[in-house]
């Protein structure tokens, strides 16, 4: 079946899905959770086929591709968490009366058909499907060739579970064609698809934006900063940086760049770098920070634009909060940015002027996540400004429409 035909099939199934009650949708999700749990060994064995042929087994992408029993069961827990979330469809977000006799309600409604194009992340196959179903949207899944066996296996388990439960399995479509041509064909199905979400690095985001005839909700990489201000609690700053870098360095919300107020650098750089070395982190430093610790490596200018996704970070001194804000807005990707400070006015200036989906005060950047924000599973982190920004959960997969009632009102 062609990609275009699959998109048309998804459009027809979306109309059926919009008639499902919350209870119906939760039954579908429950069937998916039970299916994944029952067939976890099959999923892991198919994942191993992808792992065996993956070229760089030390890369961040390899870690994202890897599935084991713990990670598969985390996917199951994620599905069950979405079951417990409030269904946004039909929620009245505003309601008012007009002198003309109109009673107007603004109501949340599904988008229709959502296509997700993603890289070597088999967990997205589950997250995207269940979030779309719960929010009343049909899903079209197009993963990468690096995860093709894993994605096929997960989709097969989900599809069979949904059909066995007595529901329309076509509410989730899987594009088996992992080529660029297949992706381009999907991106031209504007008559069938309402929204496309790229989930991956800047290259994928650029490809989708350049080729799509469908509105795009960009979920891109992170180039996250932590600014340590002159009023910062230095021990608190070290702990926050360690968690933001080392908790899971392959994620887009891991910190990559440390900006340090020059007035505290002599005190802070040595204690930070002792901790970083203990954690196995490679530090790329500007000339001033390198002069304080010659065990660091001198950073090149291009390093400050890098998303390392590994145990590497940069250190750079700045002359104050305004300088830090300028650096972040110039080099950041509008993802997650943090200030460590004990000065409330300085914190307010930072959170007001830094252009990012999430700004943090004395908090690890690792919290930019659907589960941590209480959204359940997420479709990605939107770094754009239109429609939705930050973690893409259920509400972000709906739009608002108007229901207007009257007792025969006529416009004069």
Where are the regions a protein language model picked out?
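N-terminal Rossmann-like NAD(P)+-binding subdomain of aldehyde/semialdehyde dehydrogenases
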Residues: 1-106, 131
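Structural motif
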Residues: 112-116, 130-131, 137-140, 170-173, ...
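Flexible, glycine/charged-enriched surface loops at secondary-structure junctions
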Residues: 22-26, 166-172, 248-254, 280-288, ...
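Conserved C-terminal structural/oligomerization subdomain of aldehyde/semialdehyde dehydrogenase
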Residues: 300-412
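A structural signal for short, well-ordered beta-strand elements
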Residues: 16-19, 230, 317, 340
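ALDH superfamily catalytic-core signature
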Residues: 120-123, 127-135, 157, 161-164, ...
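Rossmann-like NAD(P) dinucleotide-binding subdomain of oxidoreductase/dehydrogenase enzymes
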Residues: 93-235
């Amino acid at each position: 079946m062609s990609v275009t035909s699959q998109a048309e099939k998804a459009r027809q199934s979306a109309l059926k899905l919009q008639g499902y009650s919350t209870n119906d949708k939760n039954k579908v999700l429950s069937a998916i959770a039970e299916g994944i749990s029952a067939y976890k060994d099959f999923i892991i064995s198919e994942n191993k086929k992808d792992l065996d042929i993956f070229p760089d087994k030390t890369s961040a992408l390899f870690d994202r591709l890897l599935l084991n029993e713990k990670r598969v069961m985390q996917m199951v827990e994620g599905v069950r968490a979405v079951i417990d979330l409030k269904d946004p469809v039909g929620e009245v977000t505003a309601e008012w009366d007009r002198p003309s006799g109109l009673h107007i309600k603004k109501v949340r409604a599904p988008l229709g058909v959502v296509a997700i194009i993603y890289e070597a992340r088999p967990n997205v196959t589950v997250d995207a499907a269940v979030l779309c179903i719960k929010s009343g949207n049909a899903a079209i899944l197009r993963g990468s060739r690096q995860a093709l066996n894993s994605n096929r296996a997960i989709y097969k388990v989900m599809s069979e579970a949904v059909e066995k439960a007595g529901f329309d399995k076509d509410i989730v479509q899987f594009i088996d064609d992992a080529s660029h041509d297949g992706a381009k064909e999907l991106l031209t199905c504007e008559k069938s698809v309402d929204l496309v979400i790229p989930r991956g690095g800047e290259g994928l985001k650029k490809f989708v934006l350049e080729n799509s005839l469908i509105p795009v909700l960009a979920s891109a990489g992170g180039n996250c900063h932590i600014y340590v201000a002159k009023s910062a609690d230095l021990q608190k700053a070290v702990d926050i940086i360690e968690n933001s870098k080392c908790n899971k360095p392959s994620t887009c919300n891991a910190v990559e760049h440390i900006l340090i107020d020059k007035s505290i650098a002599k005190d802070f750089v040595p204690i930070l770098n002792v901790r970083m070395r203990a954690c196995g982190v490679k530090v790329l430093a500007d000339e001033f920070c390198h002069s304080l610790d010659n065990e660091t490596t001198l950073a090149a200018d291009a390093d400050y634009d890098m998303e390392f996704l590994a145990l590497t970070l940069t250190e750079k001194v700045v002359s104050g909060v305004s300088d830090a804000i300028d650096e972040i807005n110039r080099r950041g990707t509008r993802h997650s940015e943090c200030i460590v400070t004990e000065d409330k006015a300085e914190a307010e200036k930072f959170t007001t002027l830094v252009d990012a989906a999430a700004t943090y005060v004395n908090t690890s950047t690792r919290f930019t996540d659907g589960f941590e924000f209480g959204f359940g599973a997420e479709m990605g982190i939107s770094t754009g400004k239109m429609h939705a920004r930050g973690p893409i959960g259920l509400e972000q997969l709906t739009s608002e429409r108007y229901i207007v009632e009257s007792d025969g009102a006529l416009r004069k």
